């Protein structure tokens, strides 16, 4: 983990590997190491630049409500600072929304975009869910994580975690980032519908069939609305990035190779 001072803000990021650069955005409550398992399973070397949202990792805590476009501008400025003119972009959950918006705003710089459990517009059920997350985290991050694991993994995935479940809960709860409430407030406001028609980079949309938070129909909508998009459905819940990292790496590797 390292950081960069930009416009009086500290921007945290991780830098791993060598090769063509990939700008990777994490999901709500997370930090830039969210893509570690996918990176480790990747079929070929890449340079992974993990961007920390405000309030995550080494990034400064937000002083106002988060603005998606400002996050995108900061991330692209970071890539320029690191010497990258063009790059692949990938994102998970809120990070997928950010990656898609990045591809729409900077079509000349984004080589490909990968959306993992992304969506265009937060619907009523999602807004209620995100509000519940805010309340649970405020009460007890461990209570939130017990709910998240129960709802975010498949039964098969929870079977695999069973021998170490309490340890996983404790570790995961300790990783809930200080800026999570701001992330969730942004989640509730998401609407990038108008951006979908502006994305010209090859786009891989990965949806999780058992996702209870971002319904698989959200992935279907992205894939049908974005020119040059392909769809992959994986048999997992929203926490697919932990449960099926190898499958994500394989699909994304094929996408980047093409």
What are these regions (language model features)?
Residues 236-249:
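Catalytic histidine-centered segment of alpha/beta-hydrolase-like enzymes
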Residues 9-61:
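Conserved HGGG/HGGXW glycine-rich cap/lid loop of the alpha/beta-hydrolase fold
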Residues 199, 205-207, 211:
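Short beta-strand/loop motif that positions the catalytic acidic residue
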């Amino acid at each position: 983990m390292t950081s960069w001072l930009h416009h009086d803000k500290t921007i945290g990021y991780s830098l791993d590997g060598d090769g063509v650069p990939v700008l990777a955005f994490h999901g709500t409550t997370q930090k830039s190491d969210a893509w570690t398992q996918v990176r480790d399973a990747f079929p070929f070397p890449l340079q992974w630049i993990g961007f920390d949202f405000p309030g995550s990792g080494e990034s400064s805590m937000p002083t106002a409500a988060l603005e998606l476009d400002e996050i995108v501008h900061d991330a692209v400025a970071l890539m320029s600072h690191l010497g990258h003119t063009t790059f692949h972009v990938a994102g998970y959950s809120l990070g997928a929304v950010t990656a898609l918006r990045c591809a729409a705003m900077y079509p000349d710089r984004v080589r490909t975009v990968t959306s993992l459990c992304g969506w265009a517009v937060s619907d009523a059920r999602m807004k209620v869910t995100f509000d519940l997350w805010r309340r649970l985290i405020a009460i007890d991050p461990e209570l939130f994580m017990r709910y998240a694991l129960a709802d975010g993994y498949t039964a098969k995935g929870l079977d695999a975690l069973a021998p170490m479940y309490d340890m996983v809960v404790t570790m995961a709860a300790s990783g809930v980032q200080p800026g999570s409430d701001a992330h969730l407030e942004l989640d509730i406001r998401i609407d990038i519908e108008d951006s979908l028609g502006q994305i010209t980079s090859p786009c891989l949309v990965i949806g999780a069939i058992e996702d209870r938070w971002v319904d698989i129909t959200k992935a279907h909508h992205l894939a049908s609305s974005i020119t040059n998009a392909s769809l992959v459905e994986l048999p997992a819940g929203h926490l697919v990035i932990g449960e099926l990292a190898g499958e994500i790496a394989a699909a994304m590797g094929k996408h980047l190779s093409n």
